[in-house]
Amino acid sequence: MTRPKKPALPKAKKVRGVVPSAEAQKLLINAAIEMLHILPFDQVTARAITKKVGLSLPTISNNFGSMAGLFNEVTIKLRNNVLARHHKILDQSISLDPDFILRTRLVAWLTLEGENPGQFNNQLIENIAPQFQTALGGLSLRTTTAWLTLIIFMVEGHALFSEVHEYPATQITDGITLLTQLRQQLQNSENALGWNN
């Protein structure tokens, strides 16, 4: 029985001399993201990351305190990448973005590994609620927050379990179409619930 081949990574670079902290952090974060996209998370180790970029092993603890600190910075970088690509507040394709999916899975994994979930709370709802309210014609903060909470739970669930369920692409498209239609009814729902005060 032959073993499956591991994904090929670029060859490790020779060990660099001393580099400025900001440069080291950038190298480590970018290398971690590249590796997390193609390897099982438990194979993305401090040794593997530092070897890939040619830095010494203590560079991670010197710059981030620990691997958890590095991974926390990775989640922030992934979030910023996603928001930069999907700056239109009503763009629902964010849920299919590879960095969004990676961030969601990484946060879930780190939480299961015992990390404090609160450190990964990026106040996404608080940050986008005002823009979302304006885009939809002035919904109340209560309605906006309730809607965004449901949407975030759905897209995070999709990021974690889409491969388990193996839904056809048409089913996902239909779901997004239905959500778009429901979103257009939020003002009526808000009025019916009395949340427009």
Question: Which role fits each region the language model picked out?
Answer:
Residues 21-27, 31-69, 73:
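Helix-turn-helix
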Residues 122-125, 134-197:
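Hydrophobic/aromatic-rich alpha-helical bundle segments in the mid-to-C-terminal region
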Residues 35, 81, 131-135:
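Short alpha-helical functional segments enriched in proximate histidine and acidic residues
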Residues 1-23, 194-197:
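N-terminal intrinsically disordered/low-complexity leader segments
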Residues 114-117, 124-133:
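Mature extracytoplasmic domains of secretory-pathway proteins
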Residues 27, 102-106, 146-153:
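Amphipathic alpha-helical interaction segments
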Residues 73, 80-113, 125:
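Hydrophobic alpha-helical connector segments
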Residues 64, 70-78, 82-85, 118-121:
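Alpha-helical DNA-contacting segments of helix-turn-helix folds
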